[in-house]
Regions:
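Class I S-adenosyl-L-methionine-dependent methyltransferase catalytic core
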Residues: 1-231
């Protein structure tokens, strides 16, 4: 008889620990900024929430993830939305949030839930505001979700650009070798295929001695172009 796979917490390095601290401080600053506006409803949205607990590669011990930290924010948020595609992670997260009527946990595709269910309810005119943490495991977040959040005027986005997955699966030195699945994922993340003209430029040296026709741009150039696209 097959047993269920053992659940293991994600391991995080020092940079991820620092990122968690930054998000935690930003959350407190965000709610503090609206402290004198009681009519505003402030929501915290974590689109790739994880289990709420991580293992530190540095110490070997457990550390709180972004959801657990957000729940302790002072001044507090009025509601929390935690989303993750991994049912085991959301199951563990529910154990952390027992008794919290202000917490909503969703298992599934973040982009689908954000665009079809959650973001349409974050209405600027009804004094709703949201801090959205987009820290995808890879190229799992779609442009449609980011675009809707940006156009709402009610949402502040905190996006961790998935550079590693982008380089591993979509933007290679030889663009002709990239599999269709990688291209499709990048298209959904970017919103269209215009990333190609950003990621690759014509080789100024020409095609000498078998050199490639195009040259892959640096991560910094690509991320900067995406940042401008979000404006």
């Amino acid at each position: 008889m097959n047993s269920m796979p053992t659940f293991k917490f994600d391991q995080v390095g020092i940079w991820s620990e620092l990122k968690l601290e930054i998000v935690e401080k930003y959350g407190a600053a965000y709610t503090a900024a609206f402290a004198n506006e009681p009519r505003l409803k402030k929501y915290y949205v974590d689109a790739f929430s994880g289990a709420g607990v991580h293992i530190s590669k540095r110490s070997g011990g457990t550390i709180e993830g972004s959801p657990a930290r957000a729940l302790k924010t002072s001044p507090k948020f009025d509601g929390f939305y935690f989303i993750d595609m991994d049912a085991q992670k959301t199951a563990h997260l529910k154990t952390i949030c027992v008794g919290r009527s202000d917490v909503h946990i969703e298992t599934g595709d973040a982009s689908e839930y954000l665009t079809k269910v959650l973001l349409p309810t974050i209405d600027y005119g009804k004094y709703n505001r949201a801090l959205c943490l987009f820290d995808p495991y890879g190229l799992h977040l779609e442009w449609r979700a980011m675009e809707l959040a940006g156009k709402s005027r009610a949402v502040d986005m905190f996006l961790n650009f998935p550079v590693m997955d982008m380089n591993r699966n979509a933007i290679w030195r030889n663009p002709d070798a990239v599999p269709k699945d990688g291209i499709d994922r990048m298209n959904r993340f970017w919103g269209d295929d215009s990333w190609r003209s950003t990621a690759y430029v014509e080789n100024a040296q020409g095609n000498l001695f078998g050199a490639p026709d195009v040259v892959k741009q640096s991560n910094e150039v690509i991320v900067s172009a995406f940042r401008e696209r979000l404006r």
